[in-house]
Amino acid sequence: MGVTCVSQVPLAEGKSVQQTVEILTRKLEQLGAEKQGTFYVDCETYHTAGASMGTPGQAGKLLYVMHNSEYPLSTFALFENGPCLVADLNLDVLMVKLKGFFQNAKANKMETRGTRYQYCDFLVKIGTVTVGQSGRGITVEVDYCPCAVPGDCWNLMMEFMQSFMGSHAPSVPPVFSAKHDPLYTPADTMVQYMELLNKIRKQQVTVAGMR
């Protein structure tokens, strides 16, 4: 586990989601990156009822329960603007038993799946975001494996991302500056995915509202 940056890449002009993914993967392969299997990250949204939590009249909060194929024995639970809980897979069973407090918004389940690439000390994952069977966007995750302190390797990561993302290379993730502990953790990656998937979800809602 190194330092990870998760970002969204817009569709290339006149291209579909799949065609844009192919453009990105072609650039990676031209650099010399090699395929290293596949990956997925999923995110289920749960609503908390204010009344059931002992606060009548208060709007419910959102809880995101997430999984990452890099950590197959773990489940991540994140509150909006809150802490990230890392648990084992029994948390999924517990959520079913807590349905009186947390209601699963099944229509809002999102996931990103794609191919992993290895390039020197970098691991790159390019994924297609889907809701149901509908493609909604593209995620790019870049891991710099030898380092665990974001401030020590960000410039190198940025230079590498620009080599295949061009002007779409991201700025410093907010989670880096929000950390109290200088060491990067898997929870920081899940926070980035949660924020990005929410952003993509809201983009779709906005587009639908304009039609």
From Swiss-Prot:
Keywords: Activator, Nucleus, Transcription, Transcription regulation
Domain of life of the organism encoding this protein: Eukaryota
Record's subcellular location: Nucleus
InterPro entries: Mediator_Med20 (IPR013921)
A biological-process GO annotation: regulation of transcription by RNA polymerase II
GO cellular component: mediator complex
Molecular function terms from GO: transcription coactivator activity
Pfam families: Med20 (PF08612)
Family: Belongs to the Mediator complex subunit 20 family.
UniProt function note: Component of the Mediator complex, a coactivator involved in the regulated transcription of nearly all RNA polymerase II-dependent genes. Mediator functions as a bridge to convey information from gene-specific regulatory proteins to the basal RNA polymerase II transcription machinery. Mediator is recruited to promoters by direct interactions with regulatory proteins and serves as a scaffold for the assembly of a functional preinitiation complex with RNA polymerase II and the general transcription factors.
Subunit structure: Component of the Mediator complex.
Record protein name field: Mediator of RNA polymerase II transcription subunit 20
Annotated organism of origin: Xenopus laevis
Encoding gene, per UniProt annotation: med20
